[in-house]
Structure formats: C-alpha cells, structure tokens
C-alpha cells in the first residue's frame, strides 16, 4: 500500500498546476490569486529547466497546453540555458509567455556567480549598454554584477535582439501585442538573470504592464543606486525563504549590493532545515501558497470548490476511494497531499463520485467497498492510498502512492505502486508529479476516457 501511495503524491504536482479551482465565478478573483497561480507554474518551470529534455515538470505543463522550447546558447565563454513557453488563458484573454532561466548547475555557472565586481549600468540600446559597462566604475551611479551582466548580454545577443538591435521573436511579439504578457523567471543565478533581463527589456521599450519577473532564491543584481533608480519600474515578485542564505550572500560577503521588488518570504521551520536553497522546496511552498489563496477566494464567494460528484453524459462513472495513512499525517509535509491527489483524480475523470472522505485505512473490507460503489451506481472502482515512511536514523522519508482499478464486480483490472525518497523540506510535490504521470498513463491505457490532455484555465467553468 505504501508504494501505491506515492503514485498519489505524484498527482499532487499535477493537481495544483491544473488548478482544481472554481466551478464558477461571482466576482473577479484577486490579483493575488492570479499571481500565486502563475508563481506555482513558474516554480514548476524552474524545476523543469534543470533537465529540459527529460523533465516531468515540463511534460506535466505540456499536458495543460503549454508549448515549451528549451534553449542552450553560447557566446564566447558564456553559456546560457533557459526555456521559452507560451499558453493562452481565455479567462484573462491573454497569451502568457514564460521565459525560465536555469540556476547554477555546473562550474561554468559558478564562474559567472563569482565574477562579483560591478560594471556600470545604463543605456537604451545594446551598443550604449556595452559601452557604458566598459567604462571605469562611476562612484554613486547604478552598477550591476559583472557576471550576471555578461550572462544577460549573451541572452540578448543570441535570443532577444536582431542584427539591428531591435526586439525579435517572442520578445517582439509581447512588445507589440496588447493581449500578451511575459513572465521572466528563474532560480538562484536564473532569478538574477531574469531580473536583469527584465530591466534591459524595459530600457529597450517593452511596455512595463506586459512584463513581470518571478525569482526564487535569487541574489541581488546591483548596487543601491541601481535599486533606487530602476527598482520601481519593474514588477518583481522576489521569493525567498527564512533558511536560504543566497539572497543575502552578495550583501554579506562583498557589500555594495541591494535587493528590491515585492518580497515574498516563505517561513521554513528550523526543525525542518537550517539552510535550504533547493528549488524543489520553493515548488512545494508555491503550491501550498496557491491553495491557501484559493481557499480564501472560496471563502469570499468568488469561486466555488470542485464538486465531489460529477456526471458527464456518455462517460462511465468511477467511484473514487482515497486513503491516507496515519504515518503520512505525522510527517512535516508542506501541503495536504491527500487533497492534491483527490483534486487531480477529479480532473482526470469525466464522471466520478468521491466516496467516504473520512475513510480510514481499515474501515471497510474490499467486498464492502465494492458493494457501496455498486449501490451508488459506479461502473468502475478506483482505490488509491498515500503513505509516508521514515527510515530509522535516515534523513527524509519515502512517499508512496498505490493505485488499484476494479470493475463493478470487484475484479482487479490494474494496480500500480510507486515510491520516492524526499527530504524534510523538499521534493514532495516533485515526487507526486513523477508518480502522477505514470498513474495517469496506466489509467488511460485501461480506460481510454481518462483525460490526459487539459485546457489551460485559471478556474473551471
């Protein structure tokens, strides 16, 4: 049962990105709701960009309509790794372009981080920017980290500007289309690159209302004069946590740097970790943060929660039984994993009914579950279990997901059991995401009506 549980956990990842949100709206949802939704999407992309060719997170986003194009480009000694994605959201009547920069992953990346001396910042063309950066540092004037500046310069030359120094590609499209918004995002080095590129794009004429930056655990990019002169121009959601030393590292060890932007700090208990910079942790928190805002919108009557019963004409009814172990309840997971799993299954099944939600592990024998499901009108019975197992004298725990599918007579059609080790502060949603992809694929093979591709939406109609 433990392994079956982990598969369920995987469903968590899918769930939140799919937004199990509202069935209808009464009033417009808050900007916080929209911000937190896209923050969680950006967090998934920040994980995916580390392994762009074999990424569960990218595959999950693609299932929800995101078109993703990984990029790996080089100019001189600098190599850039990022991904460009886009999707259309009818609720906003906007096409969202998401550009995600990878954090530090090798020695070349760290060589960029360690080029901590500053260069002048300014100019409205690439030529002006380059010329100013080569001049002797001007005291009291805006200046930025030379390594980050070189990284962004490479991105601009290879992907942002044409031979005439004009915006091209998706950057040109966003600048010219009133129905487009660009989100620049990244973790650590990637977050610094996203922030500095955002400022460069504004200098090159990008309308500020069409641009937002979401950074996770990113160091400062410039000095106090830079923050004061340019910080208010760029909409920056700067996300850190109470145990991450990286955002303050340049100020602490080198001095002369200053952060700016809307600071969002996740509170990480010292009992979980004293130092935590991993992107997987930020992913967990961003999903949990979104769900908190979702619940707030429900309480305000702006959206309605997903029903525990749904019927689609012509689609078989599936009785959904979800079990959560007592062990899992005792673990310091950031989110309610059972809720994530349940919501994700709701998304996959055109017709479903959630059975006794308070059901304990040994509440009913198998024949009782079959009888109750048949009495309720089910054509199929899907039983899932989530568990968390801590090994003695070991860090972290194993999250397991078990999934078993039966016909209405109680005959087993398929069963899966998956598991993955995670650390106390990281990896819960990521582990669930990996299991989800396998679980959904197996269910679809048995039941072709199970959905594997979804329309992007901020809330369900």
Where do the PLM segments sit?
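Short, surface-exposed "cap/lid" segments of acyl-processing enzymes
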Residues: 79-81, 90-130
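Gly/Ala-rich beta-loop-alpha elbow adjacent to hydrolase catalytic centers
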Residues: 186-190, 194
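Bacterial N-terminal signal peptides
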Residues: 8-20
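A structural "domain/chain start" motif
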Residues: 220, 303-353, 449-461
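Surface-exposed short loop/turn segments
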Residues: 364-413
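Serine hydrolase/lipase
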Residues: 28, 95, 125-133, 143, ...
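Boundary at the C-terminal end of the N-terminal hydrophobic targeting segment
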Residues: 21-25
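C-terminal/domain-edge helix-coil "capping" segments
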Residues: 310-318, 375, 406-461
């Amino acid at each position: 049962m433990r392994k079956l549980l982990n598969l369920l956990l995987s469903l968590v990842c899918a769930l939140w990105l799919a937004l199990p949100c509202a069935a209808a709206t009464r009033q417009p949802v808050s900007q916080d709701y929209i911000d937190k939704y896209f923050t969680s999407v950006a967090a998934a992309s920040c994980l995916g960009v580390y392994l762009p060719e074999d990424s569960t997170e990218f595959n999950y986003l693609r299932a929800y309509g995101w078109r993703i194009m990984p990029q790996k480009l080089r100019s001189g000694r600098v190599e850039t790794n990022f991904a460009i994605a886009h999707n259309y959201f009818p609720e906003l009547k906007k096409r969202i372009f998401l550009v995600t920069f990878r954090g530090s992953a090798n020695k070349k990346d760290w060589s960029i981080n360690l080029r901590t001396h500053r260069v002048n910042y300014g100019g409205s063309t690439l030529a002006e920017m380059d010329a100013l950066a080569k001049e002797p540092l001007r005291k009291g004037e805006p200046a930025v980290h030379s390594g980050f500046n070189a990284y962004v310069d490479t991105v601009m030359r290879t992907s942002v500007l044409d031979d005439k120094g004009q915006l091209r590609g998706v950057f040109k499209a966003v600048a010219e289309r009133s129905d487009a918004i660009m989100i620049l995002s990244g973790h650590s080095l990637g977050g610094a690159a996203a922030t500095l590129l955002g400022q460069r794009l504004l200098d090159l004429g990008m309308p500020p209302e069409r641009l937002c930056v979401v950074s996770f655990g990113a160091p400062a990019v410039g000095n106090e004069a830079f923050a004061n002169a340019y910080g208010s121009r760029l909409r920056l959601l700067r996300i850190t946590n109470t145990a991450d030393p990286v955002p303050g590292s340049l100020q602490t060890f080198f001095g002369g740097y200053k952060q700016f932007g809307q600071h969002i700090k996740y509170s990480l208990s010292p009992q979980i970790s004293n130092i935590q910079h991993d992107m997987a942790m930020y992913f967990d928190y961003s999903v949990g943060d979104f769900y908190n805002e979702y619940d707030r919108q429900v309480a305000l009557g702006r959206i309605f929660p997903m029903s525990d019963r749904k019927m689609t004409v012509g689609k078989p009814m599936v009785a959904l039984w979800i079990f959560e172990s007592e062990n899992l309840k005792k673990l310091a997971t950031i989110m309610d994993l059972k809720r994530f799993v349940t919501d994700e299954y709701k998304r996959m099944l055109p017709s479903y009914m959630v059975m006794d939600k308070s059901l304990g592990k040994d509440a009913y024998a198998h024949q009782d579950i079959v009888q109750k499901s048949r009495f309720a009108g089910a054509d199929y019975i899907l039983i899932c279990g989530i568990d968390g197992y801590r090994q003695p004298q070991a860090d972290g725990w194993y999250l397991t997901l078990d999934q078993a599918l039966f016909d209405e007579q109680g005959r087993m059609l398929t069963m899966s059991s998956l598991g993955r080790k995670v650390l106390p502060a990281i990896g819960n949603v990521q582990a669930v995401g990996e299991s989800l992809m396998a679980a959904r694929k197996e269910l679809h093979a048995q039941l072709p009506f199970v959905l594997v591709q979804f329309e992007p939406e901020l809330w369900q109609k």
